[in-house]
């Protein structure tokens, strides 16, 4: 029965996120408040622009991550297959959705070594929630998640707001930081910690860095609001009223990124949450990210075909290249030095 409830919850989440009329939020990721200074004399050949980078010791053609979306339900099998095939073609990284259901049910449902066979040359990131980490069970779950897809790293997602609003959610978060510290010591792969759409503050980032986390994904407000999603799933008007108040809650992605990058400029950061296009991606990279992630924005394409996913990211890549060209940036290292200004008042 527990597995059935988890599977139904995953299916509910997919249905809601795929419908643009549902789970609406007014929160902004904040990138519209930043503006590049246009370079009218770039003095470079567009064809010489390179977006190559290294992430988790693998060479990528662009600093893009297919962010964690779905896992553990039958319908996610073809979604993850399309994403993995596209990641391999494009040479970009891929994170899978939570593997909790797959581990507890012993049913991979596409979250297995098939993904590594489909994407042998790119970083694959396993995924578990912080709620699954406490005690020895947490270490076992983490190892199984990594082994299941032969992952290059494990993502631990932090979602206290969603858990607080979700019927039956985990509201006891004591010991989660200690569990993360233990995983850093015990796991044979790097640990990536991310939020799921409410952002990571400078204070929490400091705690994670002190714990030994390798990468932080700020996953800020401005994209999918899981509070709004849980509001849509609510069984009672009272639950809905509580959840909907938090639809716009969180630290905007750009703000979280700048705060952490200023304090720890050498810390590898992923920017996700409301990245709508290649210009947002360029701004995120300039503001301190080493990688940029998208999830919901590509979910519709992933449900159709590998080619649709490739087409989607090729648009993002071309937009990013144009942004480089018009800031006089031949490479990502040049882009990180491009002139950018904070515009307080936006239309």
UniProtKB/Swiss-Prot annotation:
Keywords assigned: Cytoplasm, Flavoprotein, FMN, Isomerase, Isoprene biosynthesis, Magnesium, Metal-binding, NADP
This enzyme's EC code(s): 5.3.3.2
Pfam families hit by this protein: FMN_dh
Top EC category: isomerase
Record-linked SMART domains: IMPDH
Top-level taxon in the UniProt lineage: Bacteria
CDD domains per UniProt: IDI-2_FMN
Segments passing through the bilayer: none
Binding of FMN, residues: 67-70, 98, 127, 194, 224, 274-276, 295-296
Binding-site residues, substrate: 9-10, 98-100, 162
InterPro entries (UniProt xref): Aldolase_TIM, FMN-dep_DH, IPdP_isomerase
GO biological process, one term: isoprenoid biosynthetic process
Function: Involved in the biosynthesis of isoprenoids. Catalyzes the 1,3-allylic rearrangement of the homoallylic substrate isopentenyl (IPP) to its allylic isomer, dimethylallyl diphosphate (DMAPP).
HAMAP family: Idi_2 (MF_00354)
Family to which this protein belongs: Belongs to the IPP isomerase type 2 family.
Descriptive protein name: Isopentenyl-diphosphate delta-isomerase
Species assigned in the record: Pseudescherichia vulneris (Escherichia vulneris)
Gene: fni
């Amino acid at each position: 029965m527990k597995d059935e409830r988890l599977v139904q919850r995953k299916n509910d989440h997919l249905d809601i996120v795929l419908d643009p009329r549902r789970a609406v939020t007014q929160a902004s990721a904040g990138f519209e408040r930043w503006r590049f200074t246009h370079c009218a004399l770039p003095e470079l050949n567009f064809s010489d622009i390179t977006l190559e980078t290294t992430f988790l010791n693998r060479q990528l053609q662009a600093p893009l991550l297919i962010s964690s979306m779905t896992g553990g339900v039958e319908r996610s099998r073809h979604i993850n297959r399309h994403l993995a095939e596209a990641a391999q073609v494009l040479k970009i990284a891929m994170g899978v959705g939570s593997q909790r259901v797959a581990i507890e049910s012993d049913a991979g449902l596409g979250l297995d070594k098939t993904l590594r066979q489909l994407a042998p040359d790119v970083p694959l990131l396993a995924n578990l929630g912080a709620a699954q980490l406490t005690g020895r069970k947490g270490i076992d779950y983490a190892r199984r998640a990594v082994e299941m897809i032969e992952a290059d790293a494990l993502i631990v997602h932090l979602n206290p707001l969603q858990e607080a609003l979700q019927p039956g959610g985990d509201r006891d978060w004591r010991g989660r930081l200690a569990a993360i510290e233990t995983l850093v010591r015990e796991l044979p792969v790097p640990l990536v910690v991310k939020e799921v759409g409410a952002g990571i503050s400078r204070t929490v980032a400091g705690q994670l860095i002190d714990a030994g986390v390798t990468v932080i994904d700020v996953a800020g407000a401005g994209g999918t609001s899981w509070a709004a999603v849980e509001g849509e799933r609510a069984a009672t008007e009272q639950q809905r009223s509580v959840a909907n108040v938090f639809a716009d809650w969180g630290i905007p992605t750009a703000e979280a990124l700048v705060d952490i990058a200023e304090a720890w400029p050498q810390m590898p950061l992923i920017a996700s949450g409301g990245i709508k296009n290649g210009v947002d991606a360029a701004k995120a990279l300039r503001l301190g990210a080493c990688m940029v992630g998208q999830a919901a924005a590509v979910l519709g394409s992933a449900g159709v075909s590998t080619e649709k996913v490739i087409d989607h990211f090729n648009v993002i890549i071309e937009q990013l290249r144009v942004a480089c060209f018009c800031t006089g940036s031949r490479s990502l290292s040049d882009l990180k030095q491009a002139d950018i200004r904070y515009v307080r008042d936006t239309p």
